Every structure is written in C-alpha cells, then in structure tokens.
Amino acid sequence: MGSHEQTADVTGQRFAALALAALGVVYGDIGTSPLYAVKEVFAGNHPIPVTMLNIYGSLSLIFWALVIVVSVKYVTFIMRADNRGEGGIMALIALALHTVHDKPQHAKWIMIVGVLGAAMFYGDGMVTPAMSVLSAVEGLEVATPALKPFVIPLTMVVLFILFFVQRSGTATVGAFFGPVMLVWFSALALLGVHNIVDHPAILMALNPAYGIEFLLENKAHSLVAMGNVVLAVTGAEALYADMGHFGRKPISRAWFAFVLPALVLNYFGQGALILGDPEAAKNPFFLSAPDWALYPLVGLATLATVIASQAVISGAFSVTRQAMQLGFVPRMEVQYTSDREQGQIYLPAVNWGLMVAVMILVLGFRSSNNLAAAYGIAVTGDMVITSILATVVVAKVWKWGWFKAGLLFACFLSVELVFLAANILKIPDGGWFPLVAGMGVFVLMTTWKRGRQLLSDRLRGERLELSMFLDSLASSMPTRVAGTAVFLNADPKGVPHALLHNLMHNKVLHERVVLLSVQFFDVPYVPDIDLVEVRQLKENFWSVVIQYGFKDIPNVPEALALCADAGLAFSSLETSYFIGRETLIPRLGSEMAFWREKIFVAMFRNAGSATAFFKIPSNRVVELGTQVVL
C-alpha cells in the first residue's frame, strides 16, 4: 500500500513538473497575447468605437475563439492526432501521407499543402519575437512618456541578446521558464480580478449573444475587428507542436486548470477597465495595473515575451531539422546544446536569418500597432492548413469517414476562414510581409525537393546495376588493398559513382567494401532494433541500410557499430569513407524552370557536407567529385 502511494506521488510530481515546464514553453506565445489583443481592437490602426456593445461583443468573441479554436479544436481533437507521440505540422503531414501511399497524385497535394503550412510557420516565426518584445517594452511609454525614444533601441538590444545566447542552448535558463510563466499567468489573473471587481457585469460577455450582436451591429467593420480578435489565439499551434516534449495530458490540464482561466480573467479585466474609463483603451493591459506595479510589470512582461520568442525560435530549429531529414531543405549545420535532451538544438543559419528578419521588422514597423497588421495572417493560414490535413487523418486514420470528419472540421474552418478573411484585409498595411516570407520559404522548400528528385533520377539513369558489377568482378578482379571502404550510396540497387571513380583512377578495391544507404522515414523515431539492415553480397561486398525517423539524430559510426551482431565489425582506424560530391550545371529546357534550377544549384553548392551531417570522422573521409548536367 505504502509503495503504491509512493509511486502515485512520484507520478503526480512528474506530472506537475511536466505541466509547469509546459507553461514555460508551450504557452509563452498565447500567454503574451493580452499585451496587445484588446488594445488592437479599440486603439489599433482600424479601431472600433468604445461603446458598451463593442466592449461586451469583442470580449465575447475573444472568449469563444479561445474555447472553439484552442479548447475544442486543438486540445480535444488535434492533439489526439499524434505520430507516435509527436505533434506539429511535419507529424501531421506524415500521418496524412500514410493514408494515400498508393495514390501519388493525392500524396503530392498533401505534400504541397503541408509544406505551405510549414512555410507559413516561418512567416509567423519572424513576426512573433518582434511583436511580443516590442509590445512589452512599450509599457515604458505608459510608465514614463519621456522614455518613448528608447523603446526601439531597447527592443533591439533585448532581441539581439535573445538570438546571441541561442548558441549556448536553453538548458540552463530553460529551468526558469516554467516558474516565470507561472508568475506571469498569476499576474494576469490578479490584474483581471482587480478590475472585474469594479465592474462585475462585464462577465455577462461570456454570453455568445453579445458576440453575435456585435457582428450584426458592426456589419462589414466587424470583419476588421475579427482580424484583431484572432490575436488572442496566436500561439495555439504550439500546443500541438510541442506535444512530443511534454505529452498531451500535462499540456491539456495546464490549459484548462490555469492558462485559460488566467487569460479569460485578464481579458475581461481589461474590458472592465475600458468600461469604466474609455481613455484606457490606448493600452488597457498596462493601465490595468496600479502605478506602483507598472515597472515590475514591464520587466515581467519583457521576460514573458522573451520566453514566448524563445519557444518560436526553438520551434523554427526543430521544424527545420525535421524538414531537412524529410528532404525539403538542404543539409545545414546542427549543433546539439544538451547532452541529455536531443530536442535542444541550434542551427546557426536559421538563427541569424531569423534575427535579421526580426530586426528589419522592428525598424520598419516601429510600433506594435503597426506590427499587428503583419501578425495573424500566417497564423490563421497555418490553422486552416492544419484543419485540412487533420480532416484527412480523422477520416482515414481514425476511420470516421469523410462525412463525419468533414462535418466536424467544417465547424472549425467556418471560424478560421473568417479569421483568415479578416487578416487578408491587413495585407496592404503589413500583412504582405509574412506572406512574402512564407511564400519565399515555400519556393525554396519545393525547389529543393523537386531538384533532389531530378538529380536522383538523372544519376539513376546513368547507374550501373550492382548485380552486373559484382558478376564482372568474378572474371576481372582488380587489386584488393587492406582495410574497409564505406561508400555512401543513394540507390541500394546501383553502384555508387564514388566507387566507380575510385576504381577508374586508383585501379584498386579495398579488402572489404560496404555500400551504405541512409534512409529517412516519416515517423519520428526508429528503434535501435530496426535501425540497420545488413546483407552480405559477393566478393566481400556488404550492403548496409540505416533507417532514421525525422526526429532522430543521424550518426553513421554509431549505427555501423550495431552491425557487429550481423558479423560486420568495424575498426575506426581501418575504415575509410568515400563520398561522392556532384557539381551541378543548370541547362535550359529541363523539367524544372531555369530560374528554379539556378536556385537549386545555389542551394546545393551551399548545403552542409554529408561528413558533418552524418557525424563521420573527417580525417577518414575521401571525397570524389563528378559533374552532372540537370
């Protein structure tokens, strides 16, 4: 009995720790939305009049958006669509693709829609840090208007420090994220209660009738307001994306028990404040605090927005690595910043690229009011794409059938498409930025995928069949030298070009030759028992296939060590790795547009080396080049 209670207690402690950690990572973005959501409705670039109906109506819409989009869609349904415990757009693409493996045309469209969703994520990832940190630092203007000239420089400094420390990893400071966000959400709730007490009638806005009346009364202008209401649910996709780190239950319990109540109390508190003092609409979040709490609140808000930005940056690293292993982006340098957590990674190219984009946004838009126009369209586009992919998964994987699945997600899409339409109106004011950025990423990802496919087809067309090559060795065996040669081989049925070049120029073969193929599958992880497949061929040739999931960390020497059980042992001092390196030449009239060929060639030229990506010892590598005309 005592042992059972102790186990339950440990389990409870573990669950509480996961829920606290989820507060710091999952809820940073949506948790900082109170800084600007209500303000943008009444004091943004397209404000609505401060009337009782508009206050009640906008709060009602915010509340029901949180319920329908976050509580029902994401927590109740989407988070159940996991790929072996993992969530996020890449996991959803993989699940949807499983349903159409025998229909290439359907798979193509699922791939296009999914990649578009991933590209929109990058557009959102550029705007979120700029919008969040700038909104927090703007609190200084409320405290002391004389500090207004320092808002932009201070925002730039905070953002630079944020991106600069990424290479050190978040393992140390990450331990503080949860407690800081616990204080933040507690502060949100207390500020809300403080103002609701003065005008408790504001709670009547929980009635959806006020939201409907607001839409009917404001007619076309209500669509503009909906573009600002959606700011309250930005960050909802993080619940699904980070599910693999914390699990569905800790994330959902934290939402219903703590995050949702704190957000609702704060939004309604801001509404109560504006109800009593319409002038407070210019910045209701900071004006809802007592004077003595203003500077501490600015400091806490800045910390919270840095944490929210950190989650987006880490998400960009994670999505990029997954996209890399699924073949949508070229290999690039990946640094692992924690010995214990393989999810904690750092990609220098992504980090500095994001930083430049964020700095340009801050300098270009110069205020959170202006940035709000750029915020939302990428998020709502991502939500719509998630609903489309989830419909496929629910219909085919969960076996609900198209009618029931379509009916369910039609309800969500009816809300999300209104949000998307509202944000399309923002395109001239700044919504073009995440769209252009997202479409740019989409073009790069699809160009890389298509280019790799064309290159593979070209090399396959020139290949020598492995069986024919091995048969020819029996009649004309070249000189064999001591040691083991490992040739990376994209096509297990063909002879690697590097092997043919080595044989042509050096006239020798190693005593033992290993043809190594590395394959990536649309599952998060591959267990060790399935990691390697070993086959012995003729003439002391061996075929080894290493299989990774899209979240695995490729390490060829470690994987090859598992081959010993199949009779293929490796000595690091006697093993050489031969890698082919192609020089690409674009040409007019190929299957891909010439301008895309040029982009692909540039990406290919700047891609990271296979040596670093697969953790192969550089002092044991021989690279052999060849020219390929696309």
From Swiss-Prot:
Keywords: Cell inner membrane, Cell membrane, Ion transport, Membrane, Potassium, Potassium transport, Symport, Transmembrane, Transmembrane helix, Transport. Its main location: membrane. It is a multi-pass membrane protein. It catalyses: K(+)(in) + H(+)(in) = K(+)(out) + H(+)(out). The keyword Metal-binding does not apply. It is found in: Cell inner membrane. The chain crosses the membrane at residues 15-35, 59-79, 109-129, 145-165, 173-193, 223-243, 255-275, 297-317, 345-365, 374-394, 405-425, 427-447. GO terms for cellular component: plasma membrane. GO terms for molecular function: potassium ion transmembrane transporter activity; symporter activity. InterPro entries: K+_transporter, K_trans_C, K_trans_N, Kup. HAMAP family: Kup. Belongs to the HAK/KUP transporter (TC 2.A.72) family. PANTHER family: LOW AFFINITY POTASSIUM TRANSPORT SYSTEM PROTEIN KUP, OSMOTIC STRESS POTASSIUM TRANSPORTER. This is Probable potassium transport system protein Kup 1.
